[in-house]
Amino acid sequence: MNNDHASKKSFCIKAPSNWEKSYLEVWPLVTVPRQCICLRWCISKEYHEFTCSSLQFIVIRPAGTSVLLGRVKSSKANQLVGIEHVEGSRYALIFLSEKLDFKSLKVIANHQLTKSSKSLSNVSNKPLGDQLFRSNSLMSPSLLKKELHRIQSDASQANERESQAPHSFVTHDLISSSKDGNSLTHEFANDSVTEMVQDYTPSCSRDVKSLLDHLYNSYFYQLLMTKTPVVFYVKQMVGKTRQLAVEVHNHVEEKALVDELLKFLDNLKSVDDRKSRLLQCFESHLNYKAWHLEFENEAHQYEIKGYRLWLQNILNRENCQITKLDFEREFSQLKLKEYEIRVLLYFEILYLFLKWDPEYARRRANDNSLLDSRDSGKRKSRKKNAKTLNPFETAQLKLEFTFDGLCIRRTIEQNATERSEDLLLKFCKETIVPYYSSKFPRITRNLLEKCNGLDLLPERSHKHRHSAPPRSKLISSKSEAGRALPGNTSGASISNTSSPHSEASISKDYEILKRRRSNSGVHSLTRSDSSFNGFERDTRRRSSDIARIKNREINLPSSSLSKQRNSMHDISTNFPRRNLSFTEKLTMASLQGQSEESVQPKTTSSLSRSKTLSILEGSVSKRSEPSMDSILVQATPRKSSSVITELPDTPIKMNSLDKASACTVENHIVTESPAHKSNKAQLFVCVPTTPVKKKSASP
């Protein structure tokens, strides 16, 4: 950028490679709405890319809000260009057609050319977009006239420098248009100030038209002009819209107000009705043709403005390679948004009707009770004599149909995208439940039932929270049942030696615990009640242990081992003996008893697997006998009468079974208990005693 261009109030940009000069000199003329260029001007298909220091001048398709018009000098002729600030440091440079008609343009001054012309010389210090394009800086009518006059004088000076002036009609049109300064000022005020005020501030009047304008404005603004969540829309309706409706109701007749609201609901066109025209303009844009978005039917001004802005936002993408698939994707999201906004709007209309006349909802409830009767004849006669729907019923039917469409759309979208989050339930949780569930409980329940969202209701979550008993109460009931278990067993006393893990006792205790739990009022258990689940787990483990004990093999020493042991015993008498461990001594005693049994006939006291299992089964089945409650493996201590006087070198053979006998094996005594004589089904147990050292003979 050169400083000598500042006196000419122009700026330079880098020219394309096929141009003779390396830069383009641009004289700014005026700023016009970008929409006018999109609608009325044909744009060439030849797009060029320019760079100027750190700025990037790119050519995009028609979109945006405002464009700076200027002239470019070339070797052949002058050419009109349009420069648009898009976003950040991105700009669009468009070569426009020479067939311009400034009378058809509405001139607005959303930037000050005095500041922009001064800043053209130092672009490197400050971004060009910060000075050239200020969409929010509005000018007063008097200042607007001065700026228009300055623009005209600058344009006339630029035309005088040209050797040929084939485009002098531009300045003439500017001068002719500036003569009617009042009309320009009036148009500017109507188009910029009043529309912005109507878009963002509610009207202060208290008539029906002001309420309808506010409803139209808020509806299309949320649908087409913003990307904020719909929860902000419902907050606005609960606040501003509801307050304005109440004030209008105080000044207007109720019947007229209700009729106007119903007419408003009928006049809301679906986005499907506008799709064909939107798609036609989109395809014209892809083919580099001029397009003008208008609707055949009568449309509200906010609706037209909203659809134009929505379409421009689609076209004004960073990636210029947009296709029809992108349009379909954006339109599908717009359809979903329309369903959500309409559901909230119908809820708010129902609230207003109910607030103005509660009889609407009462008559609706009575009609439902009659229609739900089982008598088909009465139902048919009721349908024949039914009158037209009241306003409450009309709005409710629209609400139900719209919510059905929302459910279908969300289901299709969730199946196509495979999202984990349910956006339909999220919408109900954030908007319907907190704002309208308490006012319309029956309607809300019917809608949530369609999307499996009944758990979102406060009373249902309250029931789930209190359906399970408190944990302290559950634990106390279990402890009481556990303490009552011993008293509910058989009347006979249980000996201390009885096994606590028998299968019959465990199953019986489990049945008692279940009966105690049912009597104590505990009806349901949650997944957090791990104590009772632990008891069931222990019960199954104990029963499996008993089955494993029954099937366990009892390994007894074979006859070959006993013969080998006897032969080794004869050899060991000739050698000095070493100190044996307790296990070896116990094994020797068992082998000695086994060898004795092999000689004598088989008796009831033999250690066989079949006899042991029969004893085990008999002890479990006969619970009534105290002596048979266990396997009765008893350890009998050594009697005080059994005095060892001398330890012989060789073991003593077992005597006859009719007398009490003692078998001495080295330093241990195997004693048969007197109780075993009366009950031959009992077992032998080896009892260790304190070894006694052998007294050495005196020399």
Swiss-Prot record:
Region of interest (Disordered), ranges: 459-505, 517-568, 590-610
InterPro entries noted in UniProt: DNA_replication_reg_Sld3_C, Sld3
Annotated GO CC locations: chromatin; DNA replication preinitiation complex
Listed name of the protein: DNA replication regulator sld3
Keywords: Cell cycle, DNA replication, Meiosis, Nucleus, Phosphoprotein
Keyword DNA repair in record: no
Subcellular location, principal: nucleus
Biased composition (Basic and acidic residues): 535-553
Highest taxon listed in the record's lineage: Eukaryota
Gene that specifies this protein: sld3
Organism: Schizosaccharomyces pombe (strain 972 / ATCC 24843) (Fission yeast)
